[in-house]
Amino acid sequence: MYRALGGNHPEPHFRPGSWDLVCEGGLIVELDEELHFNRYRAQTLDGDWAKDLPWTTPYKEQCTRFESLCMKAGRWGKRWTNPSTEKLFGEPASPGDLDGVGGAPRWKQRALYDCMKDMWALDQGVQLARISVHDRISDRTVEDALNEGSRSHDQAIVDLVAARRLHHP
């Protein structure tokens, strides 16, 4: 996947980071904000390995539908590129130019690290659930429900996490 995203370092060192939320009982929840929804993340979900992930279909749709929001939030500074991502993926295109050579190295890294976590969860039998700020519960997005500070959407969020939980045989 690293090479498919344009990775060019002969001996890359990866650091996908920690999980967003580790719950009692071993459930891990990743809450993905707007910077996770773009063509690079969609590319990582195209393989056969991802077909049974409960978030693949909605995430691929959101990558297409919300890439413009990703661009708005992530076309500048370290959200577009940084020295460590350039070591992995090479020089970036001009900020905002995803069709240019290099694209957005930081976006590629984020997509790769999400993919690595997904693959690891599949391989290791980890109970991972991914939800998106763009997911809809009741009449609003998860982001709006979380920002409200109200507890009125707690059960809807719990239900979404349960629906997106990776189940292993």
Where are these regions (language model features)?
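Nucleic-acid endo/exonuclease domains
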Residues: 1-169
